[in-house]
From Swiss-Prot:
Assembly notes: The cytochrome bc1 complex contains 11 subunits: 3 respiratory subunits (MT-CYB, CYC1 and UQCRFS1), 2 core proteins (UQCRC1 and UQCRC2) and 6 low-molecular weight proteins (UQCRH/QCR6, UQCRB/QCR7, UQCRQ/QCR8, UQCR10/QCR9, UQCR11/QCR10 and a cleavage product of UQCRFS1). This cytochrome bc1 complex then forms a dimer.
Gene this chain is encoded by: MT-CYB
InterPro entries the UniProt entry points to: Cyt_b/b6_N, Cytb/b6-like_sf, Cytochrome_b_N_euk/bac, Di-haem_cyt_TM
Keywords of the record: Electron transport, Heme, Iron, Membrane, Metal-binding, Mitochondrion, Mitochondrion inner membrane, Respiratory chain, Transmembrane, Transmembrane helix, Transport, Ubiquinone
Function of the molecule: Component of the ubiquinol-cytochrome c reductase complex (complex III or cytochrome b-c1 complex) that is part of the mitochondrial respiratory chain. The b-c1 complex mediates electron transfer from ubiquinol to cytochrome c. Contributes to the generation of a proton gradient across the mitochondrial membrane that is then used for ATP synthesis.
Source organism phylogeny: Eukaryota, Metazoa, Chordata, Craniata, Vertebrata
PANTHER family: CYTOCHROME B
GO CC term (a single one): mitochondrial inner membrane
Protein name: Cytochrome b
Topological type in the membrane: Multi-pass membrane protein
UniProt miscellaneous comment: Heme 1 (or BL or b562) is low-potential and absorbs at about 562 nm, and heme 2 (or BH or b566) is high-potential and absorbs at about 566 nm.
Residues holding heme b b562: H83
Cofactor note: Binds 2 heme b groups non-covalently.
Any Pfam family hit: Cytochrome_B
Taxonomic source organism: Nycticeius humeralis (Evening bat)
């Protein structure tokens, strides 16, 4: 009798992708980080969407909305901590994925490596926006410190920082 995972149309797709995947026998666990990145990204998107349903960006009520999420929303505290720790796990997996690429010499494939560098910069820019956009003192500090690095650019650095800040300093809510 044949196994259902090899005969059922939907189970067959999953079986061929995960269980009976044709992969070399010498592949190591270092090659799992791309899949782990996908799982972490999916977790971030889902928890971020559910958190955004209850978050308020107004400066007067932002902290209260986070308190509301943690206390009043069913498993809101789990969503918040999964989102926060999922971001850390995402970057751990990302750096290990890049480290594996360096170790195995993937940088020799120039087009692939350059695309990875572009993706790394895009991920870092997205993470910066996710860190700075929600209102709070910590995001003001993050915006000030990280964007102040631009002031090191000769000639245009100070003007660039002032343009990004919209003035002489970071002020008010950044999500409105």
């Amino acid at each position: 009798m044949t196994n259902i995972r090899k005969t059922h149309p939907l189970a067959k797709i999953i079986n061929n992708s995960l269980i009976d995947l044709p992969a070399p026998s010498n592949i190591s666990s270092w090659w799992n980080f791309g899949s782990l990145l996908g799982i972490c990204l999916g977790l971030q998107i889902l928890t971020g969407l559910f958190l955004a349903m209850h978050y308020t960006a107004d400066t007067a009520t932002a902290f209260n909305s986070v308190t509301h999420i943690c206390r009043d929303v069913n498993y809101g505290w789990v969503l918040r901590y999964l989102h926060a720790n999922g971001a850390s796990m995402f970057f751990i997996c990302l750096y290990l994925h890049v480290g594996r690429g360096i170790y195995y010499g993937s940088y020799l494939y120039k087009e692939t490596w350059n695309m990875g560098v572009v993706l790394l910069f895009a991920v870092m820019a997205t993470a910066f926006m996710g860190y700075v956009l929600p209102w709070g003192q910590m995001s003001f500090w993050g915006a000030t410190v990280i964007t102040n690095l631009l002031s090191a650019i000769p000639y245009i650095g100070n003007d660039l920082v002032e343009w990004i800040w919209g003035g002489f300093s970071v002020d008010k809510a950044t999500l409105t």
